[in-house]
């Protein structure tokens, strides 16, 4: 895992996975392959660009960083003193073939994304084709050396098969566990007309600009509607818009405030241009809040397929406004979608399901 302390602080899905594996006595230990902060900054500066989206993309697909992390991970594994009979890595940034293949150790990976899915989220022509191909080649080499691949979503599982040409027998849907237990919706008022948006970065790519434009149209018909935007001080000063800064879910006070915002929300909206997984939709569903996402990436699978809301065309503020108006006009339908989302969390999106699927596959190889 990269950056164990950071993953723990933010309560990431990957940290929760390892915690659940530990509680079920299936975890021998964790090798943290995080690199020093000064080196991470130097690598990021190396990829500098005037356009921040391009800068981030170059950094995400940096083969120098991948190779550096891979070497650190191999050294960490060679020094690991615990007993283990299988290896589970997070993501595709680590090429550990030189360690596990000579030792005949079954190796697996767990993913919320891959390079093909990531590149589809970028503006066309943002990076040279050669840069993208190098990243694809690196990932393909990693996957070819693994015994199996686990994904958070069925959408991503299809990408591994269709884009990388991997065998369906090698790719396994594992799922995702909600960080929040579903609570009773008795007494929840869906007629508050409070719309919640959560994003700690990439405001435009997460659909924030489109949502603001849609909300202006909604406000004309529902004057008491409120748009609550959480994740960063976005410097937005508009009638009916309430902005909260970053809330650290690792801090008890911030976590309580975060959950209270979901509790009071009538509708969660994040029309992101793409989502690797969209954990925040699961958080909303855990609180019985119906969702609107965009018709891209994993959002149709999580939201629409679970009858927890719907998806609209990415970037289409008119369609988004019409959908919000339709939903706010029908609190009964909002409640039904909220209840459906909660059922999905209870029956599907829990870590017991995830670790059960992972352990079931790994046991066939040991």
At which residue positions do the language-model features occur?
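Carbohydrate-associated surface elements
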Residues: 155, 177
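Aromatic "clamp/platform" in nucleotide-sugar-dependent glycosyltransferases that forms part
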Residues: 273
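Conserved donor-binding/catalytic core segment of Leloir-type glycosyltransferases
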Residues: 182-217, 227
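Membrane-proximal helix-turn-helix segments that form the acceptor-binding/catalytic region
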Residues: 128-149
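A short, well-ordered alpha-helix in the C-terminal region of glycosyltransferases
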Residues: 319, 326, 333-348, 354-360
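Nucleotide-activated donor-binding/catalytic signature segment of Leloir-type glycosyltransferases, i.e.
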Residues: 231-267
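Conserved acidic donor-binding segment of nucleotide-sugar-dependent glycosyltransferases
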Residues: 305-306, 310-317, 326-332
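Short hydrophobic beta-strand element within catalytic cores of glycosyltransferases
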Residues: 290-293, 303
């Amino acid at each position: 895992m990269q950056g164990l302390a950071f993953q723990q602080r933010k309560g990431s899905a990957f940290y929760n996975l390892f915690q659940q594996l530990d509680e079920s006595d299936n975890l021998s230990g964790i090798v943290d392959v995080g690199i020093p902060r000064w080196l991470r900054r130097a690598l990021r500066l190396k990829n500098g660009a005037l356009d921040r989206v391009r800068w981030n993309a170059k950094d995400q697909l940096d083969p120098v960083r991948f190779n550096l992390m891979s070497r650190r991970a191999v050294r960490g594994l060679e020094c690991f003193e615990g007993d283990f009979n299988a290896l589970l890595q997070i993501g595709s940034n680590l090429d550990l073939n030189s360690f596990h293949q000579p030792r005949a150790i079954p190796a697996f990976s767990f993913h919320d994304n891959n390079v093909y899915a990531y590149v589809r989220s970028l503006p066309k022509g943002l990076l040279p084709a050669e840069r993208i191909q190098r990243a694809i080649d690196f990932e393909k080499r990693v996957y070819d050396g693994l015994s199996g691949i686990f994904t958070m979503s069925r959408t991503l599982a299809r990408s591994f098969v269709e884009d990388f040409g991997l065998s369906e027998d090698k790719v396994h849907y594992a799922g995702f566990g909600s960080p929040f237990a579903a609570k009773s919706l008795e007494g929840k008022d869906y007629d508050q007309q409070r719309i919640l948006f959560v994003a700690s970065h990439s405001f435009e790519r997460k659909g924030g600009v489109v949502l603001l434009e849609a909300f202006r149209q909604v406000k004309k018909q529902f004057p008491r509607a409120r748009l609550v935007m959480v994740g960063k001080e976005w410097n937005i000063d508009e009638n009916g818009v309430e902005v909260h800064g970053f809330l650290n879910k690792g801090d008890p006070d911030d976590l309580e405030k975060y959950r209270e915002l979901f509790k009071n929300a009538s509708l969660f909206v994040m029309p992101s241009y793409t989502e690797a997984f969209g954990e925040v939709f699961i958080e909303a569903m855990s609180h019985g809040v119906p969702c609107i996402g965009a018709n891209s990436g994993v959002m149709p699978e999580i939201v629409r397929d679970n009858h927890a809301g719907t998806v609209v065309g990415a970037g289409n503020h008119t369609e988004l406004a019409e959908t919000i108006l339709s939903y706010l006009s029908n609190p009964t339908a909002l409640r039904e979608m909220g209840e459906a989302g909660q059922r999905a969390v209870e029956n599907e999106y829990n870590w017991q399901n995830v670790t059960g699927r992972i352990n079931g596959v790994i046991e066939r190889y040991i």
